[in-house]
From Swiss-Prot:
Source organism (scientific name): Plasmodium falciparum (isolate 3D7)
Domain of life, per lineage: Eukaryota
Cytoplasmic topological domain: 1-3
Gene name, Swiss-Prot/TrEMBL: TRX3
Identification of the protein by name: Thioredoxin 3
Entries under InterPro entries matching the protein: Thioredoxin-like_sf (IPR036249), Thioredoxin_domain (IPR013766)
Family the entry assigns: Belongs to the thioredoxin family.
Length: 180
């Protein structure tokens, strides 16, 4: 067994490897932000182009959808929202009552109903801790943009934080805009 000793303390290479993997896992989101070109999904551009084509076709054919805002309550199910919506886009906001940026951005989020045909879902992570864990939410608020591609809901974009410019760009890219 290979060991690395520092003074009177020795570590096996296996343990050092595990520690390095834990450190990389912990800092992975920061590393992805610093070096985004190394972590690009090669299909992301194709998916974005396909979504753009679908939205453009809906605009031309005037296939208008509905705008819905849902605040997921204790008994609410996110799966039920996905199965029942007629929209091609769903945007989920993960937040909390105690989160000031979440409360500040809430009206902006709701007002998107005036500009886009979209299903908006507001989830309080304190009421739905399982959803928080399932979606691996690390920051509040977090916005997840889903698009229905070939009858399958695909997570196409995530915005962490309350930056309205980033959120607006995602709405423009992944949601059907209402006529002005």
């Amino acid at each position: 067994m290979a060991l690395i000793c520092i003074g009177s303390v020795c570590f096996s290479l296996f343990h050092i490897g595990v520690i390095i993997l834990l450190i990389i896992n912990y800092f992975s989101s920061h590393i992805k932000k610093i070096f985004p070109s190394f972590f690009k999904n090669p299909n992301k551009e194709e998916i974005d182009k396909h979504i753009g084509n679908i939205l453009e076709a809906k605009r031309k054919n005037k296939q208008l959808e509905q705008s819905i805002y849902i605040e997921l309550k204790n008994t609410g199910s996110l799966n039920q929202v996905f199965s029942s919506t007629q929209n091609s886009s769903i945007v989920i906001k993960f937040g909390a009552v105690w989160c000031k940026p979440c409360n500040k951005i809430k009206e902006y989020f709701k007002n998107q109903l005036n500009y886009y045909y979209v299903t908006l879902v507001d989830i309080d992570v304190d009421i739905h801790p399982k959803l928080n864990d399932q979606h691996n939410i690390k920051a509040l608020p977090t916005f997840e943009f889903y698009f229905n591609l070939n009858n399958e809901w695909v997570l196409v974009h995530t915005v962490e934080g309350a930056n309205q410019n980033d959120i607006e760009k995602a709405f423009q890219k992944y949601c059907l805009e209402k006529a002005k």
